[in-house]
Amino acid sequence: GFVDLAKKVVGGIRNALGI
């Protein structure tokens, strides 16, 4: 669903930032 997709996007961004 949209929520799962949003979580994946946020997780990817945080991972890219090294947070």
UniProtKB/Swiss-Prot annotation:
Top-rank taxon, per record: Eukaryota
Disulfide bond sites: none
Pfam entry (one): Antimicrobial20
GO biological process, one term: defense response to bacterium
Places the protein is found: Secreted
GO cellular component, one term: extracellular region
Tissue: Expressed by the skin dorsal glands.
Keyword set, alphabetical order: Amphibian defense peptide, Antibiotic, Antimicrobial, Secreted
UniProt KW Secreted keyword: yes
InterPro entries from the UniProt entry: Aurein_antimicrobial_peptide
Keyword Secreted attached: yes
Function noted in UniProt: Shows a weak antibacterial activity against B.cereus, E.coli, L.mesenteriodes, L.innocua, M.luteus, P.haemolytica, S.aureus and S.uberis.
Protein known as: Uperin-2.2
Lineage: Eukaryota, Metazoa, Chordata, Craniata, Vertebrata
